[in-house]
């Protein structure tokens, strides 16, 4: 589109015309000497005045040619517009401003040029490596062309430069060009052709004074080095398939076309892909196949010859030449035929024994099912396929084994520390048993192993076992007993070939070291609390059972707590107590005797025949204590000079022919570990008159009677004590004696 340019006289290319109408003022005008205008654009020249209210303006060219523009006056401004700029506007223009009698005139030179478009790059043909090509650079509608300079570059390399300095015969817009011929190479790929044009008009100011165009080089390479790969082979079986892959070098990458050469030499297009796959090939698919790589600058071809051969039928038997099966499983043998439309099948064993299976035919496949498979099926089986006049036979061997369960580990009894136990490891229903090995481990140590290498009389499922006896200890607790069974059949592939069972050992310990602790003591006073604590070692920890032994020897159960407590012991609680530690491995027993003591009581101290006797009489002093066992009896005679311990027998002291000095206080002390009790009496001895020996008949009778009665009384007292009291009495010998 044409541009519009406004030029104002004065500063910055503006034409100012200043008129001073005042009698004392002067008019001055400031303007640039030149202005540039491009042909086809619009330019406006504006003339302005100051200092005059009503100036008048006029425009003309310096040579009085037509203005070729429109003038518009507004106040102090006058504008000359050239729309569009043409060669007729290339003049020096004058603006005259009149204010009263004053006139002022200024001029401006309008320079005309044309440089509207970037250069154009043209190629004589596609850029092909190794082939020359002509590059033309065009600059259209340029003026003045004698100021034009053109450069053509390939990347940063200058190919050609040209100036147009010939004189112009007339003013006109010209199209100028620069031509260069060069041969592209691989190194030119990705480079750019640059056409640069410069309009050298330094005397005037305009933009742009330089234009350039860049064209990226699209360098082509004609297809070459075309090659073909064939998979699996160029010789094929009828019904097979083939994949042919073609590749060709070039730039841009060539497109691949596959064709087949007909008998008349023409090509039959098959595919536009690089890979051609032919399936279910027939004999007529034999022939020559052509691959062509094609791009914009050429093509390159390669041929391959395919030969399709007649294919014979084949027989396959699955799952393979050998099948490993476990007795009791289901086995399916499959015989398949290919490349035969109507085959017939037959099955047999290699030794012509019964098949013992079910045969089924479906099209090109026949199956023999053995379910469940047993020892009678351990044979080599043959499948015969007849197709027309041809027969093919394939065989498969059925090998059997039986190893269905993990070993079974059993103990002859409970594991008790120190007691022998027999371990049995049994492997059920194994075949062939002569390949079996059983190993017995305790922890990681093998303790027994056994192989069964004896010949088998017949094919059968066998149950084999390994036994051993060992003495467990507490160190065995936590260890693992492992029974490992291995079926050594290396020539057969199956899993598992070894099985194992484990049993963690827990060794019991029969109760032992049973102890009883009585607190505070096994002998206590009546009313005191008693704790009897029982403990016993063993695995598992023994249970505690408290019992009391009765008078008939039997045990009376009391408690299953380790601690037996009597909060207030009574005398009848005395006796034998039994603690038993019991677990599944045995029993341990401990007895303790508990004695409940009672402080002495009911003491009786008597003098016989009386506490008052005559000198010469016989006196028995007797001390008894009721129903208390293990009591000490001490008889004393009190005196100021000190007590005298009397020699008593069963608590009785006899004084024959009592004397006056025998009179006094007699004391009985009854004590045991629970306490003591005292009793005393005063014996009064009266003297005889005249202090003469007197022996009357009456005294003789009394003496004789007392000699019989006193021992009798003593015996009565003794047996009464023994019958009615729990305990015994002591005679005091010097100090005291315990009975």
Swiss-Prot record:
Spell out the Gene3D superfamilies in the cross-references.
Answer: Immunoglobulins
Q: Which GO terms describe its biological process?
A: cell adhesion; cell-cell adhesion
- Ranges per topology, Cytoplasmic: 721-739
**What does the entry report about post-translational modification of this chain?**
Cleaved by the metalloproteinase ADAM17 to generate the soluble form.
Q: Which GO terms describe its molecular function?
A: integrin binding
**Note on domains (UniProt):** Either the first or the fourth Ig-like C2-type domain is required for VLA4-dependent cell adhesion.
Q: Name one Pfam family in it.
A: C2-set
InterPro entries assigned to the protein according to its UniProt record, in alphabetical order = ICAM_VCAM (IPR047012), ICAM_VCAM_N (IPR003987), Ig-like_dom (IPR007110), Ig-like_dom_sf (IPR036179), Ig-like_fold (IPR013783), Ig_C2-set (IPR008424), Ig_I-set (IPR013098), Ig_sub (IPR003599)
Sorted alphabetically, which CDD domains does this protein's record hold? Ig (cd00096), IgC2_VCAM-1 (cd07689)
Gene encoding this polypeptide? VCAM1
Those parts of the protein on the Extracellular side are 25-698
Q: Where is the Ig-like C2-type domain?
A: 25-105, 109-212, 223-309, 312-399, 408-506, 511-595, 600-684
Keywords associated with the record: Cell adhesion, Cell membrane, Disulfide bond, Glycoprotein, Immunoglobulin domain, Membrane, Repeat, Secreted, Signal, Transmembrane, Transmembrane helix, Ubl conjugation
Q: Which of this chain's residues carry glycans?
A: 76-77, 273, 531
Spell out the disulfide connections.
Answer: 47-95, 52-99, 137-195, 246-291, 335-383, 534-579
Please provide one cellular component term from the Gene Ontology annotations of this protein. extracellular region
Leader sequence range is 1-24
Q: Which SMART domains match?
A: IG, IGc2
PROSITE patterns, sorted: IG_LIKE
Q: Which domain of life is it from?
A: Eukaryota
- Keyword Iron attached: no
The protein's role, per its UniProt record? Cell adhesion glycoprotein predominantly expressed on the surface of endothelial cells that plays an important role in immune surveillance and inflammation. Acts as a major regulator of leukocyte adhesion to the endothelium through interaction with different types of integrins. During inflammatory responses, binds ligands on the surface of activated endothelial cells to initiate the activation of calcium channels and the plasma membrane-associated small GTPase RAC1 leading to leukocyte transendothelial migration.
What's the protein name? Vascular cell adhesion protein 1
Q: Which residues cross the membrane?
A: 699-720
């Amino acid at each position: 589109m044409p541009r519009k340019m406004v030029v104002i006289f004065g500063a910055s290319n503006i034409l100012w015309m200043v008129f001073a109408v005042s009698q004392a003022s002067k008019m001055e005008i400031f303007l640039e000497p030149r202005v540039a205008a491009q042909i086809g654009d619009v330019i406006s020249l504006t003339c302005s005045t100051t200092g005059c209210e009503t100036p008048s303006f006029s425009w003309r060219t310096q040579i009085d040619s037509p203005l070729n523009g429109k003038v518009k006056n507004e106040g102090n401004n006058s504008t000359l517009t050239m729309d569009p700029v043409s060669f007729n506007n290339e003049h020096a223009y004058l603006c005259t401003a009149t204010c009263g009698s004053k006139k002022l005139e200024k001029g401006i030179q309008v320079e005309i040029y044309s440089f509207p478009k970037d250069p154009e790059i043209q190629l004589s043909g596609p850029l092909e490596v190794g082939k020359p090509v002509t590059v033309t650079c065009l600059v259209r509608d340029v003026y003045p062309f004698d100021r034009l300079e053109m450069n053509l570059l390939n990347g940063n390399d200058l190919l050609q430069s040209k100036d147009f300095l010939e004189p112009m015969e007339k003013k006109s817009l010209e199209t100028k060009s620069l031509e260069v011929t060069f041969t592209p190479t691989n190194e030119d790929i990705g480079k750019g052709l640059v056409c640069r044009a410069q309009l050298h008009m330094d005397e005037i100011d305009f933009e742009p004074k330089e234009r350039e165009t860049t064209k990226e080089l699209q360098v082509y390479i004609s297809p070459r080095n075309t090659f073909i790969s064939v998979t699996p082979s160029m010789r094929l079986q009828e019904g097979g398939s083939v994949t042919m892959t073609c590749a060709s070098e070039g730039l841009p990458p060539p497109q691949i076309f596959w064709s087949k050469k007909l008998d008349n030499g023409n090509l039959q297009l098959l595919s536009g892909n690089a890979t051609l796959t032919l399936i279910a090939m027939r004999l007529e698919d034999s022939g020559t196949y052509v691959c062509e790589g094609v791009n914009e600058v050429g093509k390159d071809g390669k041929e391959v010859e395919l030969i399709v051969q007649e294919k014979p039928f084949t027989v396959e038997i699955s799952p393979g030449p050998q099948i490993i099966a476990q007795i009791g499983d289901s086995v399916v043998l499959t015989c398949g035929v290919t490349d035969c439309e109507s085959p017939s099948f037959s099955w047999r064993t290699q030794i012509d024994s019964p098949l013992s299976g079910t045969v089924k035919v479906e099209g090109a496949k026949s199956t023999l099912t053995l379910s469940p498979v047993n020892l009678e099926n351990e044979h080599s089986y043959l499948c015969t396929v007849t197709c027309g006049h041809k027969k093919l036979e394939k065989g498969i061997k059925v090998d059997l084994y039986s190893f269905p369960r993990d070993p079974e580990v059993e103990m002859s009894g409970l594991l008790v520390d120190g007691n022998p136990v027999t371990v049995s490891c049994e492997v059920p229903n194994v075949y062939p048993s002569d390949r079996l090995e059983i190993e017995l481990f305790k922890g990681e140590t093998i303790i027994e192993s056994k192989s069964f290498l004896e010949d088998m009389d017949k094919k059968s499922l066998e149950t084999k076992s390994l036994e051993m006896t060992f003495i467990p200890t507490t160190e065995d607790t936590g260890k693992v007993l492992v029974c490992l069974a291995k079926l050594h059949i290396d020539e057969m592939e199956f899993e598992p070939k070894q099985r194992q069972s484990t049993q963690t050992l827990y060794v019991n310990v029969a109760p032992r070291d049973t102890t009883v602790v009585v607190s505070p003591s096994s002998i206590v006073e009546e009313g005191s609390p008693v704790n009897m604590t029982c403990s016993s070692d063993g695995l598992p920890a023994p249970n505690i059972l408290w019992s009391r032994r009765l008078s008939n020897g039997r045990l009376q159960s009391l408690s299953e707590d380790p601690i037996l407590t009597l909060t207030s012991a009574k005398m009848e609680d005395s006796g034998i107590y039994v603690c038993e530690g019991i677990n599944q491995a045995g029993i341990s027993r401990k007895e303790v005797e508990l004695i409940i003591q009672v402080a002495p009581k009911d003491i009786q101290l008597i003098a016989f025949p009386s506490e008052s006797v005559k000198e010469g009489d016989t006196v028995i002093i007797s001390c008894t204590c009721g129903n208390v066992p293990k009591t000490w009896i001490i008889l004393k005679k009190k005196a100021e000079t000190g007590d005298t311990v009397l020699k008593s027998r069963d608590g009785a002291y006899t004084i024959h022919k009592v004397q006056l000095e025998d009179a006094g206080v007699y004391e009985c002390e009854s004590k045991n570990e629970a306490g003591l009790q005292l009793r005393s009496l005063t014996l009064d001895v009266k003297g005889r008159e005249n202090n003469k020996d007197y022996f009357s008949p009456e005294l003789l009778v009394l003496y004789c009677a007392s000699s019989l009665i006193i021992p009798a009384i003593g015996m009565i007292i003794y047996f009464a004590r023994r019958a009615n009291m729990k305990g015994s009495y002591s005679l005091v010998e010097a100090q005291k004696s315990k009975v």
